[in-house]
């Protein structure tokens, strides 16, 4: 090796020159040590030589003292390794414990300062420090630098450790007094070490087996070093990770000696081979090595383009096995030298050395500079270029202009391509990666038992193939499938009878018993730390998956961004640069793409759905704010127009997949979704049609997969509900309406809810004739069902087939149903169920059919009256009609008294009291007896006697159901107006429901 005069140049430049002239083996040693430091796997094993730099008493002098007390004089010549242990043992046996302890106290009761090497050791950020020294110098250095380690020098300290970092004093110390029982010194102490210190011994062995060890402060002939080296080799066995040894002898090591120790598994960094120094200047030699390590840790020795490419490639190439990575996780790969922003820009952070990422992007922009790279480096550069491009890493932030960040997820599962997934599963696997993808697709298709078993096989096969990445991800996915299965079993046991009409068991008892046995005591939190060291080093960014709260950091960040966005909204401020809502959007899609493209199972977990819901809700809330706020001069000057937010395909899918119907309703109450532009409508339609076709397939055939059904049906309901805002082709709309009316399970959407979904679809699409024909087919089917005298339509919202007829008439006033008319013309008096049903659809019938039907039907009860009004058969109330209403109210009053006595105070969905109250208020009914029925229904009372009504009982949501005529009449009523205005003001202030503001502004102000 070439020596450099350290006195000739500035120290930093000298170190760089030393580094550039180092032997390649030493360079690799330095790189590996600094890499271990960055990965939290570095352990320094500190010997007496480091304490000697602080003038702490040396061990051989203590042995000399014992020898002199025994034999009257110091030993002539050097002690052998055995004598270092035997002489203290002889003294203890001959002179006794008290004399032995007395010499210890006299010898070691000193106060010495720490030295620079203690600080330099800690500057390398070791995970643990192990030492055979008795002193407290390293303890003191830790406290000075704010590094907290649990000091363990006795057995009881192990259980009382308060930090995950240990300062392990394997030979004890004198914190509990200068007694031989507190330290390892004499021969018996060494021979009985494992027996006397089992906890410390096991802890040390565990650390040694899983970390990179650097010995410092020892001599190659030291008894401790030979014993410890044998331990390391024994513990690490086949995966023996050769420890490092910092040698600080004055003269360079002989080549034969170097080879000898390398064959024993010790990698030596020889200070004397690096620098010329005074024979007695051990501090300078220690410092030379430690400073090289520290400077290398800060990338100060990277200068050439080849080194830049090699360094980045070494960090990134293990990640080529992943289909996508989250940009924010790259900071872990580069030890926080840079931050990788979600918009694809890179920001220098902790890097104090050469700007290697800056240089990479300079090479990216310069063909001339790239052409100077060697063939190997050019290939590596292209591999890195492709990796960064695929993962959306674009440029340094300082060089970024206007960025158009595109969003693209290439997962079949994300896009709901179920048929393509099934086809892939049936094909022959070429690699273990194919099997891994198949297991994920099986899970997405609800075939969880098959998925679990395939993951189990992959785990075994990946061990044989040494494919750590597939092994780790399969372990995580298998565990999460297991969680999904246990949740499903609980759900089916508790709700299966209500949902499916019977207790449904999608998994056999044998399978459940087996997976319970296999997963008992499996702790996902321990998975990453249990992986081989090399895997942990390469895939640090995957550690967060080995955690039940793997979205925790993003959830916290989302909370911060939510507060920031809402603060901006409340203050009316403008964001410059990348706004908080854009950060939310990009982080959201980074997470989605990472999870889906790497086939990570997470879609059945509440936390994941909640994270998506919160993110999307925030984006829409911000868009509503941007749409409705006034643009001031600043806005015109800098922006010129309001927010350009629009709903893309991916946004639509995320809302469909992760929002419940109530969540969408909440959005609609707080934001004008209809004012948001919906882009990529063809892609959205393809997605919606795919859902419709899947519903049709699932419920056209026997043997429906109930597990798939439970995870798919919520998405289907939300997607078709949210489709209100999408302009569809007539063909696509037809497929959706058919699936909705003929194939959607009654238990999920009864006839009333299906009407709501259908009516919403007309907002952007109206009701083309082809769709009217589909609805007509549906009504014919319903008419045929009513042949059964026991059949009744089930509705949870008071909407029935009659409302479908009204919807048709709204869009096609002259529509006549030929088939319904034919059924009607075939009616006979005994088919009363069909007569009642078709009476409600009277407007859709031909003139002859109407006449024929009315020959069987007259207005005989309140339901006939209400149906007659709905279908337009009754335009004005006759005295006979009012008598029917009064009879109904009298019956209702009697029932009310009985129900009240029984503790029942609710009305059925078919109760007409509030409707009759409204008609009385609008003077469509003038019967004075109406006031006799006050006290049964608050809404009825509000309209019949507004002057004396108790407005504490007024429910604001009533107003949202009233039409323009009724709201106008309320606003003109002197008894109602003031009270209603106060209620509306309170709702505007304390709720996000924009409808209250619209009612207040449009009718009352």
Swiss-Prot record:
Record text on activity regulation: (Microbial infection) NADase activity is activated through the binding of SPR phage tail tube monomer protein. NADase activity is inhibited through the binding to the phage SPbeta DSR anti-defense 1 (DSAD1).
Entry keyword annotation includes Transmembrane: no
SUPFAM superfamilies: DHS-like NAD/FAD-binding domain
Outcome of mutating residue 260 to E: Loss of tetramerization. No effect on NADase activity
Site annotation Interaction with phage SPR tail tube monomeric protein: residues: 574, 576, 918-919, 922, 962, 966
Pfam family, one: SIR2_2
GO molecular function terms noted in the UniProt entry: hydrolase activity
Phenotype upon changing residue 134 to A: Decreases the NADase activity in presence of the phage tail tube protein
Site (Interaction with the phage SPR tail tube monomeric protein): 31-32, 50-52, 204, 206, 495, 497-498
Location of region: CTD: 549-1005
E.C. numbers: 3.2.2.5
Site (Interaction with phage SPbeta DSAD1) residue list: 918-919, 922, 966
Residues at the catalytic site: 134, 135, 171
Substitution effect: residue 59 to A: Drastic loss of NADase activity
Region span, MID: 296-548
GO biological processes: defense response to virus
Region (Inter-dimer interaction) residue spans: 56-111
Coiled-coil region: none
Catalytic activity: NAD(+) + H2O = ADP-D-ribose + nicotinamide + H(+)
InterPro entries cross-referenced by the UniProt entry: DHS-like_NAD/FAD-binding_dom
Misc note: Bacillus subtilis 29R7-12 has been isolated from the deep subsurface about 2.4 km below the ocean floor.
Domain characteristics, as noted in the entry: The N-terminus SIR2 domain serves as an NADase effector responsible for NAD+ hydrolysis and is necessary for tetramerization. The C-termius domain (CTD) functions as a sensor for detecting invading phages. The middle domain (MID) connects the SIR2 effector and the CTD sensor.
Protein's UniProt name: Defense-associated sirtuin 2
Organism per entry: Bacillus subtilis
């Amino acid at each position: 090796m070439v020596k450099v005069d350290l006195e000739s140049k500035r120290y930093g430049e000298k170190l760089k020159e030393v580094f550039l002239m180092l032997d390649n083996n030493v360079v690799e040693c330095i790189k590996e040590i600094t890499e271990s430091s960055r990965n939290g796997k570095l352990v320094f094993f500190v010997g007496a030589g480091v304490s000697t730099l602080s003038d702490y008493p040396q061990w051989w002098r203590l042995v000399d003292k014992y020898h002199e007390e025994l034999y009257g004089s110091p030993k002539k010549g050097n002690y052998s390794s055995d004598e270092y242990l035997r002489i203290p043992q002889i003294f203890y046996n001959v002179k006794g414990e008290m004399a032995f302890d007395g010499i210890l106290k006299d010898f070691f009761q000193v106060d010495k300062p720490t030295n620079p090497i203690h600080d330099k050791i800690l500057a390398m950020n070791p995970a643990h420090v192990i030492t055979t020294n008795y002193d407290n110098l390293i303890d003191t250095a830790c406290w000075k630098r704010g590094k907290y380690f649990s000091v363990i020098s006795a057995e009881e300290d192990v259980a009382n450790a308060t930090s995950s970092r240990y300062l392990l004093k394997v030979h004890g110390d004198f914190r509990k007094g200068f007694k031989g029982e507190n330290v390892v010194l004499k021969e018996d102490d060494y021979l009985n070490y494992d027996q006397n210190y089992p906890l410390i011994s096991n802890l040390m062995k565990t650390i040694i087996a899983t970390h990179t060890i650097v010995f410092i402060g020892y001599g190659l002939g030291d008894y401790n070093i030979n014993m410890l080296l044998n331990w390391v080799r024994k513990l690490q066995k086949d995966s023996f990770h050769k420890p490092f040894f910092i040698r600080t002898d004055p003269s360079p090591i002989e080549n034969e000696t170097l080879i000898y120790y390398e064959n024993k598994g010790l990698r030596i960094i020889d200070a004397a081979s690096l620098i010329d120094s005074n024979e007695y200047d051990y501090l300078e030699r220690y410092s030379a090595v430690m400073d090289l390590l520290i400077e290398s840790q800060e990338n100060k020795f990277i200068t050439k383009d080849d080194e830049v490419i090699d360094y980045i490639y070494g960090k990134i190439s293990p990640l080529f096995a992943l289909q996508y990575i989250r940009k924010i996780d790259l900071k872990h790969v580069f030890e926080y030298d840079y931050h990788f922003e979600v918009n694809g820009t890179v920001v220098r952070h902790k890097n104090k050395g050469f700007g290697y990422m800056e240089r990479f992007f300079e090479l990216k922009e310069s063909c001339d500079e790239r052409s100077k790279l060697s063939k190997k480096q050019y290939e590596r550069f292209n591999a890195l270029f492709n990796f960064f491009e695929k993962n959306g890493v674009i440029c340094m932030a300082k060089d970024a202009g206007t960025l158009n960040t595109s969003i693209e997820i290439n997962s079949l599962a994300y896009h709901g391509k179920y048929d393509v997934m099934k086809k892939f599963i049936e094909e022959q696997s070429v690699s273990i990666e194919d099997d891994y993808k198949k297991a994920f697709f099986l899970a997405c298709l609800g075939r969880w038992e098959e998925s679990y078993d395939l993951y189990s096989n992959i785990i075994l096969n990946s061990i044989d193939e040494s494919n750590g990445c597939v092994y780790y991800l399969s372990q995580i996915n298998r565990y999460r499938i297991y969680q999904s299965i246990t949740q499903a079993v609980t759900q089916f046991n508790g709700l299966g009878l209500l949902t499916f009409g019977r207790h449904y068991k999608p998994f056999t008892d044998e399978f459940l018993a087996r997976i319970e046995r296999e997963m008992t005591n499996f702790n996902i939190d321990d998975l990453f730390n249990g992986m081989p060291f090399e895997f942990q080093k390469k895939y640090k960014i995957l550690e967060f998956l080995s955690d039940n709260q793997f979205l925790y950091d993003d959830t916290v960040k989302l909370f911060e961004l939510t507060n920031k966005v809402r603060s901006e909204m409340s203050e009316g401020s403008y964001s410059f640069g990348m706004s908080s809502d854009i950060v939310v959007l990009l982080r959201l899609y980074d997470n989605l793409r990472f999870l889906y493209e790497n086939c990570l199972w997470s879609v059945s977990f509440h936390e994941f759905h909640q994270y998506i819901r919160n993110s999307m809700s925030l984006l829409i809330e911000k868009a509503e704010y941007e749409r409705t706020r006034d643009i001031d001069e600043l806005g015109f000057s800098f922006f010129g127009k309001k927010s350009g937010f629009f709903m893309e395909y991916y946004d639509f899918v995320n809302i469909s997949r992760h929002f419940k119907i109530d969540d969408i309703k909440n959005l609609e109450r707080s934001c004008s979704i209809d004012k948001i532009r919906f882009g990529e409508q063809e892609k959205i339609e393809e997605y919606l049609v795919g859902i419709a076709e899947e519903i049709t397939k699932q419920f056209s055939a026997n043997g429906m997969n109930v597990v798939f059904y439970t995870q798919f049906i919520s998405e289907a309901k939300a997607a078709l509900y949210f489709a209100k805002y999408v302009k569809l082709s007539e063909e696509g709309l037809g497929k959706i309406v058919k699936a909705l009316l003929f194939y959607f399970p009654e238990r999920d959407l009864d006839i009333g809810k299906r009407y709501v979904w259908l009516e919403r679809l007309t907002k952007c699409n109206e009701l083309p004739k082809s769709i009217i024909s589909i609805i007509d087919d549906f009504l014919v089917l319903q008419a045929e069902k009513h042949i059964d005298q026991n059949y009744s339509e089930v509705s949870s919202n008071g909407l029935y087939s009659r409302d479908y007829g009204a919807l048709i008439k709204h869009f096609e006033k002259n529509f006549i149903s030929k088939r319904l008319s034919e059924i009607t013309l075939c009616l006979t008096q005994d088919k009363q169920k069909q007569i009642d049903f078709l009476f409600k659809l009277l407007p859709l019938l031909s003139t002859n059919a109407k006449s024929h039907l009315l020959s069987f039907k007259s207005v005989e009860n309140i339901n006939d009256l209400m149906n007659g009004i709905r279908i337009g058969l009754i335009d004005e109330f006759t005295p006979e009609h009012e008598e029917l209403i009064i009879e109904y109210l009298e019956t209702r009053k009697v029932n009310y008294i009985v129900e009240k006595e029984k503790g029942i105070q609710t009305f059925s969905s078919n109760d007409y009291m509030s409707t009759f109250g409204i008609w009385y208020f609008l003077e469509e009914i003038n019967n004075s007896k109406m006031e006799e029925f006050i006290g049964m229904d608050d809404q009825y009372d509000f309209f019949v006697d507004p002057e004396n009504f108790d407005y504490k009982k007024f429910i604001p949501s009533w107003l949202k159901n009233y039409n323009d005529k009724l709201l106008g009449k309320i606003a003109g009523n002197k008894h109602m107006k003031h009270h209603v205005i106060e209620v509306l003001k309170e709702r505007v202030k304390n709720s996000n429901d924009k409808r209250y503001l619209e009612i207040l502004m449009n009718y009352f102000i």
